[in-house]
């Protein structure tokens, strides 16, 4: 048999026959190599034109279509049944379907979208440029990637007419519909997209930018893919691009694992638990499936099954045990064929592209990755050009399936088998909103933003846990910056100065409580009635604060609560926003002349009256004006119970400001290490009321603790956790993870538990976080540029170095830049 690829080359040189081709010494091969020195690889591609009305590609011997589909994260029976339906029922006999998963550094569009925010803030723009520059370098070094899944179908045709195109168009709708039913994003390729995608592969030059195709409908499609000045050199086992600036190698499977599943395909894009088995280069995984013509092949298989079964049951079977096993296998095949399973031919391939000096190491890494999962793959020799062409979309409909069969690279199986090795597993791609910029463990660059509606959560609240020194504060600071980048507002109530440098760097408002500060946070001053003129909901939270002032440990009784509520309403009716804590105390003492319980309440609040220790904070008109988009209140200098009360009143004032603000503006309210400030029987009521109110105006409570158990240390903290649709876990102790597994709110599987146990932080490189919400769990690595590392650092020497420079007259940005250059050589 003269294979089609050899035939195609032969036609260029007038060679009509070369039966029994010796691929090592073939004159055709020699001339093919010579041909590629002077002609274009595009001359070997089958693409002819594109029908813009139907979205179909008219190829040399087939008609086909291609589309990009969202990649899967794990699997379930429904998914596998949908894929199985493609091979078993939907695709016509003689057609081919190809799956091509690519992992490349073409991430500039992701970085650029993140970099080019519309906020207009110059300081944020400076941070974005520094981070974008850093991530572009990471991508060039193979540490940031994008995984894409391209599916193509091609049907050989003897004629191209409206009837044929109509049938294939209907097939296209059904196939794309199969992938769309799972809620994924499937997008049909047009001519521009096919040209751009194939150009990125065949003109590979290490760029992190995607090429944009520009289709000229008056020229053959295949002529528009390969650059006219691109040169290739074909060796026996690799293809060099432009004098071996980059090298392509293809690898085929020599042994499949005995047990495998569709979900396990995620292990073959890089090991999620071992950085040493992470693929640094561009790579492509291809599965081609050809649907055999049924009746003749099926009859032959049934006959062979009967023959083997007969031999196994003969006296010969007693002496040859392998016959029994073979008979059992063929018996199973016959049963499946009787159930209308189809016969297919398939091929699984891998291609890597890298610099010549790195390609051997990359190849060995790929082989090791597959071997660690029970596969054996090896480099193709003498057919590397055919292998390359056979991986490209729709080429199987133009004879490449026959060529691969001729080279003994395909295997025949039942139609359900390819499901398990379909390369459509990727890494999480997060949200569409350019919030936090993270990478997956295999390098997928993605955004995460808790306010993104497309993620399907019912609220925006976030619970964050991370041991000391594992990056929790940095993660929260970066989340704050992300909210500002989306034109949102951020309120931080802090104890420990974690946010001081950041808020000053961004020109925000820094409010510090200390012995010298003349701050008044009277909760009455900013109360504004709702649309109906009612203030009951506002006063309900003030009531909880006063109750905690009166009885911070034991809590107030129901009777005492009713007294406080009555006093609030009467004082409000008399004085409105001019009321203060002394007015409440006066009312209680006056009413207490008739009731001892009321009198006791008044006395319990003495510390917060005019003559009390803390009276200055709560009497008179509140003088805090929130006049920035980033506001940090530092309570670290306050000690004892006043810190807890100030915390609650600041929460109340933030809520008031959010409710008075623009309902379209997203607001993050960040509190760190504050679980113990929400204790007492009213803690849960306060938090639930707070969350319910701010949610109406796109507000999110973002609460951080060191351990998951901290969320169960007080009723208020537990309420915060139970009302959070997002849980972000940085490095945790095993006992905390065990607690999470028992949680009613966030349930994790055994596999997710194993992932969470592996979450770690490498100082100066990245902090890992497992983000749970919207029905999924994803690992993200927060990687910071040198400037941000210093900006967010709480390491004493770095923190103090910045502080000293600021005290000498430098701006925060200048000080951070100087220290970053000293520590890391750049900023």
What is the meaning of each model-derived region?
Residues 472:
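Conserved lysine of the Walker
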């Amino acid at each position: 048999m003269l294979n089609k690829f050899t035939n195609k080359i032969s036609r260029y040189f007038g060679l009509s026959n070369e039966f029994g081709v010796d691929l090592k010494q073939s004159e055709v091969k020699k001339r093919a190599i010579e041909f590629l020195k002077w002609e274009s690889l595009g001359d070997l591609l089958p693409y002819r034109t594109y029908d813009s009305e139907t979205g179909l590609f008219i190829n040399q011997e087939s008609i086909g279509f291609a589309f990009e589909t969202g990649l899967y994260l794990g699997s379930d029976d429904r998914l596998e049944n949908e894929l199985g339906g493609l091979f078993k029922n939907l695709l016509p006999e003689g057609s081919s379907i190809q799956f091509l998963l690519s992992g490349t550094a073409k991430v500039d569009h992701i970085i650029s979208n993140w970099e080019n925010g519309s906020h207009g803030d110059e300081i944020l723009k400076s941070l974005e440029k520094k981070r974008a520059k850093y991530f572009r370098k990471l991508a060039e070094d193979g540490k940031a990637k994008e995984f894409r899944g391209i599916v193509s179908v091609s049907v050989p045709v003897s004629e191209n007419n409206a009837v044929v195109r109509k049938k294939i168009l209907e097939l296209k709708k059904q196939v794309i519909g199969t992938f769309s039913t799972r809620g994924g994003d499937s997008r049909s390729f047009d001519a521009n997209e096919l040209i751009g995608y194939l150009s990125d592969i065949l003109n590979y030059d290490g760029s992190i930018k995607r090429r944009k195709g520009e289709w000229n409908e008056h020229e053959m499609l295949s002529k528009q893919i390969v650059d006219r000045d691109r040169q290739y050199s074909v060796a026996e086992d690799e293809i060099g691009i432009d004098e071996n600036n980059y090298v392509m190698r293809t690898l085929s499977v020599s042994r499949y694992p005995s047990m495998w599943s569709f979900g396990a395909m995620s292990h073959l894009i890089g090991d999620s638990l071992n950085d040493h088995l992470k693929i640094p280069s561009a790579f492509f995984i291809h599965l081609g499936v050809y649907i055999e013509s049924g009746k003749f092949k099926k009859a032959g298989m049934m006959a062979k099954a009967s023959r083997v079964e007969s031999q196994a049951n003969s006296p010969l079977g007693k002496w040859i045990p392998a016959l029994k096993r073979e008979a059992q296998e063929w018996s199973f095949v016959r049963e499946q064929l009787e159930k209308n399973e189809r016969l297919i031919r398939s091929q699984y391939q891998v291609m890597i592209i890298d610099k010549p000096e790195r390609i051997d190491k990359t190849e060995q890494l790929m082989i090791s990755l597959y071997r660690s999962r029970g596969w054996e793959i090896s480099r193709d020799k003498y057919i590397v050009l055919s292998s390359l062409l056979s991986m490209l979309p729709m080429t199987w409909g133009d004879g490449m399936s026959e060529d691969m069969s001729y080279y003994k690279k395909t295997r025949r199986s039942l139609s359900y088998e390819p499901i398990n090795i379909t390369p459509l597993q990727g890494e999480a791609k997060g949200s569409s909103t350019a919030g936090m910029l993270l990478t997956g463990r295999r390098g997928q660059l993605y955004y995460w933003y808790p306010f993104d509606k497309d993620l399907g959560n019912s609220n925006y609240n976030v619970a964050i846990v991370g041991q000391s020194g594992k990056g929790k504060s940095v993660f929260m600071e970066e989340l704050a910056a992300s909210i500002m980048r989306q034109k949102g507002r951020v309120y931080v109530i802090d104890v420990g100065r974690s946010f001081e440098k950041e808020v000053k760097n961004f020109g925000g408002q820094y409010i510090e409580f200390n012995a010298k500060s003349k701050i008044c946070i009277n909760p009455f001053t900013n109360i504004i009635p709702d649309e109906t003129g009612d203030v009951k909901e506002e006063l309900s939270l003030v009531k909880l604060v006063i109750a905690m002032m009166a009885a911070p440990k034991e809590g107030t009784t129901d009777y005492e609560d009713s007294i406080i509520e009555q006093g609030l309403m009467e004082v409000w009716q008399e004085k409105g926003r001019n009321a203060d804590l002394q007015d409440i105390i006066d009312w209680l003492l006056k009413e207490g002349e008739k009731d001892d319980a009321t009198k006791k309440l008044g006395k319990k609040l003495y510390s917060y009256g005019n003559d009390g220790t803390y009276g200055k904070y709560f009497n008179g008109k509140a003088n805090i004006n929130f006049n920035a988009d980033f506001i940090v209140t530092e309570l670290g200098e306050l000690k004892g119970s006043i810190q807890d009360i100030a915390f609650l009143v600041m929460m109340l004032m933030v809520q008031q400001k959010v409710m008075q603000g623009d309902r379209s503006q997203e607001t993050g309210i960040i509190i760190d290490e504050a679980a113990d400030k929400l204790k007492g029987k009213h803690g849960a009521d306060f938090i639930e009321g707070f969350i319910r109110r701010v949610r109406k105006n796109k507000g999110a409570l973002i609460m951080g603790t060191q351990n998951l158990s901290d969320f169960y240390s007080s009723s208020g903290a537990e309420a915060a956790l139970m009302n959070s649709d997002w849980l972000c876990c940085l490095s945790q102790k095993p006992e905390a993870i065990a607690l999470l597994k028992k949680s009613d709110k966030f349930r994790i599987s055994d596999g997710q538990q194993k992932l969470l146990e592996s979450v770690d932080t490498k100082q100066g490189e990245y902090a890992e976080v497992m983000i749970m919400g919207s029905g999924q769990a994803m690992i993200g690595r927060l990687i910071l540029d040198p400037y941000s590392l210093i900006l967010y650092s709480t390491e004493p020497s770095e923190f103090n170095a910045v502080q000293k420079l600021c005290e000498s007259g430098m701006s925060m940005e200048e000080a951070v830049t100087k220290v970053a250059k000293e520590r890391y050589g750049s900023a």
